[in-house]
Each structure stands twice: as C-alpha cells, then as structure tokens.
Regions:
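Acidic, metal/ion-coordinating pockets
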Residues: 36, 43-363, 408-420, 430, ...
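Non-catalytic terminal accessory segments
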Residues: 15-23, 36-51, 55-57, 61, ...
Length: 580
C-alpha cells in the first residue's frame, strides 16, 4: 500500500486480506448495484421514532392543599397530583419526559401558597426538575425537563415580584420562607409576546430547544393579550403585550434554522369543548380564542398546550397550512393534567404521531390513593407555618354558601362578598366581579383561611362617587365581549335585564336603597382597586371621583362575616331579575 496509508503499518496478512476484500467488491459491484438502485427490490432503511411524553399542568393557581372536586369527586392537591405525575414519568417507552406549565401556576391561590407569595407552589414544581434545570449556559441545560410560560395571574404582584419569583432571592419580602433564601423557579420560562416597553425585547426567552433522547423539540411561549384588561395597569406599566399568533410565528423560522421541526407552543389562552375520556378524537368542536389563534399558526407548529379558561380541551385543530395541531387543556387547580405522547422522526425531526389524554387527578382512585410522601411532607410543613393565621375561626355557616348562579346570574357567595365590601366602606352600592370569587364556604366553622380562599388577591377595597347614569352604564357593560354576561355581583341595588335587547338598553328597573335610580344623583360605590382601574373592561369605573381606599378584600369579608348573627345564612337574593 502507498506510503502514508492508514494500513501501511499493519501486518502483511492484514494488508492481504484487505486487498482481497477490495477486489471482491470490485468484481461483485455490477451484480449488486441493480438491487440497490431498484426501489422494488431494495430494502429501505428505517429509523424507529423517538417517543416523547409531555405532562402539562395548566392553571394550577397555587392549589397545594386539598379541597377541590372534579365531576363531584375529590381531586387535586400537591400530594395527589405528584403521585399521578410521577407514575406517568415512570411509564415505559418514552425517551424523554417534560413537564410543561402553560401559565397561572401562581396567583388567585389558597392561603397555603398565597400567604407565602406562592413560593410553596414554585418549590413544589422544583421537585420535578432534573439536575440539568437551573444550569443556564451549560451544555446540560438543553436537557432540562421543566418549561413554563406566563399567564395573566403571574403579573398579579407586578414585574419586580415576578422576576424575583423566577430568579430567586428574598427581596423586600417579610414572609417566612420555607427555603431561605428562596432559590427561584427551576423551570425554563418562555414567552414570545411579552416585551419590555423600554427596548422591545422579550421579558424572558421566547423559546427553548430541548434534547429529547435522540431528537430535538422546541417550546415557544405566549400569554393571552387579554391580560391588559385583566390586570391592574400599574402591574403592567413596564411591559407590552403583542399578538399571540404573530409572536409565535416570528420565532418558528428561527428554530427551523436550528434544525428543529418538532414545535410545541405553551399558550395561556383557551376555549371549551364537550369533555370525553380517552385519546384525542377527531372532529371535536372547540370554541373560544384558542381556535382562532391556532388557525393562524405556522404550518410547522404541531402542539398547543392551552390554558386560561379552566376547561377541558383535547382536539385536533387546523393551523394556517391546514395541518392538524394537537390542542389540550386540563381543567385547573391541580385537578387534572394533559398526558401528551409524541413520536418524532430522528432523521427529519418532524413529529409523525401525536395524541393526548386528559387525566383527572382523583384522590380516591389509584395512584391518588397513595399520595406522594415527599409532597405530603412538604404540604404539612407549609400548613404548619400558616396555621396560626388560617386556623382562626371567624364564623359558623348554617349551610353551604356557594357561587352557583341562578338563571338570572346571581349567587349567594357573590351577594355576601358584595355586602361585605359595601359595609366596609359605608357605601350606597357595591360591585364585585364574580371572577374574583375563588372558593366557596362550606357549612360549619368558617376559618380565616376559608375566607382568604374566597378572596385571595389582597386587593384594596375602596369607595368612589358615581352618578346614577354611570351606575346604569356599568350594569350595561356586563354584556360587552369577551366577558361572560352579567358577571357583577351587587349590593345595595337591584335591577331587571333582558339579554335579548340591543346593547345599551338591556337593564331596566334599577332600584337603589329601595328607590328608583336617579340618573343625576351621586351615589357612593364600593369595589376593589382592580375594578376601579377598569379591570375586566369596566371602563366606567375609571371616571369615578372622590376615591378613598379602605381595607384589603379579605379583611373586609372577615370583619363582615364575623359581625353577622351566627350561624350565618346565605343572603336572601332576588337582586337580579331576568325578564321573561
């Protein structure tokens, strides 16, 4: 062999064998070549797909403790949900498993999480993170199994607190820290459509690319643009929300250029459909903004993990290229999760198969009957820390006081909370958005923690002056989209409405303090600061005058409920009447 050949320094017998092999190939090539060139006779090379599992938990809302139900069965809590997630992680066949959190992980939380600024919730999910999470900048970070995006409630405490929650540190907080100093979240936060006003750059990375055991997968995040009408303006003064579809599509070509074609979107926006059991079915009818957003997505988007509406979603919807997108949402408050299975071609990187199941986390069904020991111990310590405040008995409920609405849209719980805010501010009337009612009051002893769970936002109750005409206008605003109709609980007034009439003329027969509403008269109105700033689209409140701040919402409810004759009965109702 020629000098410099890699074989020239081998024994002569190896050189001879190598030469005979080359000669044999030359002689046989004309015979064998037709078989390689003829598709009919050639055996194609196949590659087994890479199987990837994603476990998506949307709208957790700090639901570490038990107390939730799904289909009238106990469901959820940190220990129960953990038992389900760990069982799914341990399943055979997947090359990689990711846990995805499509927003509202925190906010509107029960006291076990909310009183500690939702650090317990983020610490709970940190327990699922592998060793590569939290290793930003290292080669290992591409194997982190946790990814999350923002929901509207991530902004409840403003940007400074949101940044602290993600990156860690105690900041200016005065709470007890279960882990001190607070280490931050180990999830990789992604969001493509929330940018800093100062420079237009995303607040967090728009996307991440993850190794998936022989394949790569991209996660792109987006929060609902409706956040601007769902949050206090002061909480969003440093950021801008961009169109969800356009923002996601902006980054698809970028991940494609990196050779990634398996694309999953964490979207904090949702819809609704009729629930069912089992794998994803064809032909499902999904309503809501999520369908419109998906319809405009880049053809290379494969999966959308949705959230926000707290509903069931498991469907195939078309994207802008007519290709099917798997869309999921698994209720809320730790009661369920989406178990998503993907097959990825290891050569092309495309997703070749996708299906999901929405799995209820029932407490009385295995594996929920064996709560996760580590999560149970964590919850016990959390409850011990907050017990001195949450365990204080405030009142006794004669019967359940629920948020179940009558046909006219009124509930006993809404009436009670509105009465409490009106009493706190000595106002003529009070308005409460029913979306702020986050738990119900059960018969028996009512603790401070029970009432905090009803009103967990720590909003400030205030009083302002409105004209009679402005009161009427506020009631008419209940039917504007995208809000659900008649979603204001009221106190100190009553009215009749006809939802079939044209906008601006649906409300009639308004009575205040037993007398007909006088359009020219000035009335004092109580509400929380969120509504006063135009939250939920109630812009009329921004025109109120003589604003005076009062107590925090839960304090108003605690004081009022404790002052009532015991045991407390639900308010009589009859404040809202539906015509016809």
């Amino acid at each position: 062999m020629a000098p410099g050949s890699p074989y020239s320094d081998r024994p002569y017998w190896q050189q001879a064998v190598f030469g005979l092999c080359i000669l044999s190939l030359i002689i046989l090539a004309p015979v064998a070549l037709p078989y390689f060139m003829n598709p009919a006779t050639a055996t194609p090379q196949t590659h087994a797909p890479v199987h990837v599992k994603i476990l998506a938990v949307n709208d957790f809302h700090g639901q570490i403790p038990p107390g939730q139900k799904l289909n009238n069965e106990p469901a959820g809590s940190a220990p129960v949900l953990a038992s389900y997630l760990k069982a799914a992680e341990a399943g055979a066949g997947q090359a990689a498993t990711f846990i995805a959190l499509p927003g509202d992980v925190v906010g509107a939380s029960p006291p076990e999480s909310g009183l500690l600024l939702d650090e317990p919730t983020l610490l709970f999910f940190n327990g699922f993170a592998n060793d590569c999470c939290g290793q930003a900048g290292s080669s290992c970070s591409a194997s982190c199994n946790m990814v999350a995006t923002f929901g509207n409630h991530e902004f409840d405490k403003g940007m400074t607190e949101l940044v602290r929650k993600i990156h860690g540190g105690n900041g200016a907080t005065t709470i007890i820290h279960l882990v001190d100093p607070y280490p931050g979240s180990r999830s990789s936060y992604v969001c493509s459509n929330v940018v800093w006003k100062s420079n237009g750059t995303p607040v967090v990375s728009p996307y991440v690319i993850r190794d998936a055991g022989g394949a790569k997968i991209a996660f792109i995040g987006a929060d609902t643009i409706m956040t601007v009408s769902l949050e206090m303006p002061a909480n969003l003064e440093d950021v801008t929300f961009l169109n969800e579809t356009e923002s996601v599509n902006r980054y698809v070509p970028i991940v494609q250029e990196k050779g990634v074609h398996a694309i999953v979107v964490l979207l904090h926006e949702g819809g609704m459909q009729d629930p069912y059991e089992g794998p994803t079915q064809e032909g499902c009818n999904v309503t809501g903004r999520v369908a419109d957003i998906v319809a405009g997505l880049d053809p290379d988007v494969d999966v959308v993990l949705s959230a926000h509406t707290h509903m069931f979603t498991n469907a195939y919807l078309p994207n802008a290229g007519g290709r099917t997108v798997l869309v999921t949402q698994a209720y809320s408050y730790s009661r369920a999760f989406a178990d998503v299975d993907l097959d990825i071609d290891p050569v092309t990187g495309d997703i070749t198969g996708k299906t999901a199941q929405i799995v209820p986390a029932y407490a009385d069904t295995p594996p929920g009957t064996t709560p996760d020991p580590a999560a149970a111990a964590f919850l016990a310590e959390d409850e011990r820390v907050v017990a001195p405040l949450t365990g204080r008995v405030i009142a006794v409920a004669a019967t359940d006081i629920t948020g179940t609405e009558t046909d006219s849209g009124e509930s006993a719980l809404g009436d009670l909370v509105a009465d409490g805010q009106r009493a706190a501010m000595h106002a003529d009337v009070a308005f409460v958005t029913t979306g702020s009612l986050r738990a119900e009051i059960a018969q028996g002893n009512v603790t401070w923690g029970d009432l905090y769970a009803v009103q967990p936002f720590s909003s400030t109750v205030l009083v302002m002056t409105l004209t009679g005409d402005q009161v009427r206008s506020v009631l008419e605003q209940q039917w504007q989209q995208p809000l659900p109709p008649h979603n204001l609980a009221i106190s100190g007034l009553s009215y009749t409405y006809d939802g079939s009439r044209s906008a601006g003329s649906r409300v009639t027969g308004i009575m205040v303090g037993g007398a007909p509403l006088d359009k020219e008269k000035k009335y004092t109105a109580a509400m929380v600061d969120y509504l006063a700033s135009g939250g939920d689209g109630y812009t009329v409140f921004t025109k109120g005058t003589n604003v005076v701040n009062g107590p925090v919402d839960v304090d108003a409810l605690v004081t009022y409920t404790g002052s009532l004759p015991q045991p407390v009965n639900p308010p009589a109702g009859g404040r809202i009447t539906k015509a016809g």
